[in-house]
């Protein structure tokens, strides 16, 4: 069975590689490299976050050795607009294409549930992709109770990866 471990700063380049691969495969919006760097640095080195910093907290779980990651999952603590109740939400579950037949995705979703159990927070997860969507949804339906669906509309001629996120401030 694969072992999911918490990524560290030593995994930065490999995490970045997998995040960029995931964006290339699943992008719905343009990439903001500075935001990605900020988040990776923050999640890979949580001890550097000041205690009074109210910003985003999370963890990145990985499968594979240092310098050769095979799969990655990102979780962060969040809340919904109508409550202060916290929950975990995933922002990435991705398996390198070379390792897609290994069961890593199932291992990562199990790890996500374990993290929710450890900290005692509900876990909210979504599949946001146009690539192999149905297969991913089947895995998530087998793993998590369904509580809704997610839809995305691009007005007019705007399409996924458009400049929408750069122009709507």
Task: Indicate where each model-derived feature is located.
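A short, internal acetyl-CoA/4′-phosphopantetheine-binding micro-motif in the GNAT/acyltransferase core
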Residues: 91-102
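Conserved beta-strand-loop-alpha-helix junction that forms the acyl-donor binding cleft
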Residues: 112, 124-136
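A conserved beta-turn-beta hairpin within the catalytic core of GNAT-like acetyltransferases
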Residues: 79-90
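A short helix-loop-beta-strand connector motif used in the catalytic cores of GNAT acetyltransferases and
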Residues: 41-61
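Conserved beta-strand in the GNAT
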Residues: 62, 68-77
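A short beta-loop-alpha structural element at the N-terminal edge
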Residues: 1-17
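Conserved GNAT-fold acetyl-CoA-binding loop/helix
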Residues: 20-45
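Conserved acyl-CoA
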Residues: 107-123
